[in-house]
Amino acid sequence: MVPSLLLLLTGLFRATEPAPRCETGQETLGQCQTAQKAKCVDISLSSCTDVTYTQTMYPNFLDQKSREVIEYSSEYILISVLHNLLQGECNPDLRLLGCSVLAPQCEKDKVIKPCRHVCENLKKNCLSAFDAIDMAWPYFLDCDRFFAGEEEGCFDPLAKLRGEVAVEEDLPSDFPATFIQFKHHSYSQMVSTLKKTASRCSHIATTYSIGRSFEGKDLFVIEFSTKPGHHELLKPEFKYIGNMHGNEVVGKELLYTLRSICVQKYLLGNPRIQTLINNTRIHLLPSLNPDGYERAAEEGAGYNGWVIGRQTAQNLDLNRNFPDLTSEAYRRAGIRGARLDHIPIPQSYWWGKVAPETKAVMKWMRSIPFVLSASLHGGELVVTYPYDYSRHPMEEKEFSPTPDEKMFKMLAKAYADAHPVISDRSEHRCGGNFVKRGGIINGAEWYSFTGGMADFNYLHTNCFEVTVEVGCEKFPLEEELFTIWHENRDALLNYMEMVHRGIKGIVSDKFGNPIKNARISVRGIQHDITTAADGDYWRLLPPGTYIVTAQAMGYTKVMKRVTLPIKMKRAGRVDFVLRPIEIWPNKLLRRPMEDMYDQYDPLELFDPHAQHAQARGGSQQVREKPWWWSYFSSLDLHKPLWLLKQH
């Protein structure tokens, strides 16, 4: 009986004991444990002043006990910078949703949770935007943990935004299938939509990254074919590249829209689009320079000059950053029997500053047997073709043709003639200086420069590439994009169809085994192409009669006469069967001199998906963090490791 009475008295004493006094400084840090009942207080967080309510309560759902604690937290910093990180996508929606957790609504001294369905809908629409920048979904936006169902009396933190479309292309299901929004798209919006397109049409589309920019942004490609992700025998590979210069944004938006057209028209049964996708593997890289684009976008459409954002984050012009193989081609041109194709990258090139974007594209070119390509630029209305570097460097404007001059002119005209403005004969318009040339010009004859991507394509790979200046404004206003698209629509399709000109075939031995890297030569054209891994090849040729030779180490040489009629618009099939021959040992030791470059080729070891930006401190662990990690550099402790996907 006595022990029970003592326990009762002790309990009563503790119940009536005053709360411990706060030490100096503890109250402002939210560290006081008081018995005072929490009350509603006015919201004073600068990033949450536009919420639909006026009062909140501390501690919040994260047990942060004061305004000061919240403002110094990584969660609050995140919602404050989300607009910049996601380039405007899903904002202010995400910020308001975050505010509903960090500063929840308070009425009559009672906290009200935000609605779970609002969180779930926003996560569904915006998760891909986080994926695009390699960021995990924030833990404090866990829809099950910090949100409530409508039956529990929740509130909608996005009520005032109702009626607005939060995410591009997230439109009602009954919207017309042909609806397209013509606007400038941020990097995250672009990546999000590419992934959505591939997900919804996985039978004809897929996305992949060829590498990362200097600041860590993935260089995303969307591919269209009947077997996405795989090379198919005798099906040619085509690529479009946009936004090589960050401030030249029209090419990026054209490819963004072309992606939509390819999907819509294919599903609606359009014969032209279906024929293209069924017979071609198409790769669209909308933005090769996303870092530069960000800087240009900060200036704004219509206000951007000719410099801001043109270069990469390393201050490199990507169209001057490729190996100079053109000088080597000029040196070889006078040598009897010398080859002007598949010229190796010289060792001296790697001594300079090579952008990760450049390395990624070069490795991409090696991994896929591209046949035809175009790079979309802005600032003029003209189509240029190699060589871009003059035979005599001191002569800025000199006609400098490749051995495939006729074919390149045919390719350039295929785009120019299908473009209503480029083909317009009026000299009083943008691009009027090129009217007498039919809207096309040899690159070096316009102006000479070295290190260009088009010359590298031609001299290092099998691929033919032209450069298309798609408009006189580099960063036009959004209302101009609709007109620009309609001017370029048919030209884009017409040029893609040119990948089916010339001849194609398979080189094999007498047993039907494919022969890789066999050479296909055309008499009178000092430029060979080689067979792919499956022994298939594609040789772009204009109409005419040719003597075509196939040869490979250890096999006989086979020649065939080929005639391509003027009206022939499909590649002619020309197969070769090579017979083995005996090779003397001393001949096996002979190797072309240029093969010595293969002893040092950093491109083979280059990981295009590695992070490249150098961070403070220099430690390997810091350098591997994503580009957006620097936004949280002010936090000495409690850095948001929960935002790292690998954490």
Curated annotation (Swiss-Prot):
It is an enzyme of class 3 (hydrolase). Zn(2+) binds at residues 245, 248, 377. Glycans are attached at residue 278. The keyword GTP-binding does not apply. GO terms for biological process: peptide metabolic process; protein processing; Wnt signaling pathway. Inhibited by 2-mercaptomethyl-3-guanidinoethylthiopropanoic acid (MGTA) and guanidinoethylmercaptosuccinic acid (GEMSA). Inhibited by chelating agents such as EDTA and EGTA. One of its GO terms (molecular function) is zinc ion binding. The active site is at 469 (proton donor/acceptor). It is found in: Secreted, Extracellular space, Extracellular matrix. In the early embryo it is initially expressed throughout the somites and subsequently becomes restricted to the sclerotome. Expressed in somites, paraxial head mesoderm and apical ectodermal ridge. Residues 35-157 form the FZ domain. Its EC number is 3.4.17.-. Keywords: Carboxypeptidase, Developmental protein, Disulfide bond, Extracellular matrix, Glycoprotein, Hydrolase, Metal-binding, Metalloprotease, Protease, Secreted, Signal, Wnt signaling pathway, Zinc. Its cofactor is Zn(2+). GO terms for cellular component: extracellular space. Residues 1-18 form the signal peptide. InterPro entries: CarboxyPept-like_regulatory (IPR008969), Frizzled_dom (IPR020067), Frizzled_dom_sf (IPR036790), M14_CPZ_CPD (IPR034239), Peptidase_M14 (IPR000834), Peptidase_M14_domain (IPR050753). Residues 183-499 form the Peptidase M14 domain. Disulfide bonds join 40-106, 48-99, 90-126, 115-154, 119-143. PANTHER family: CARBOXYPEPTIDASE Z (PTHR11532:SF63), PROTEASE M14 CARBOXYPEPTIDASE (PTHR11532). Belongs to the peptidase M14 family. Interacts with WNT4 vie its FZ domain. Cleaves substrates with C-terminal arginine residues. Modulates the Wnt signaling pathway, probably by cleaving some undefined protein. Regulates the development of skeletal elements during development, probably by activating WNT4. This is Carboxypeptidase Z. It comes from Gallus gallus (Chicken). The gene is CPZ.
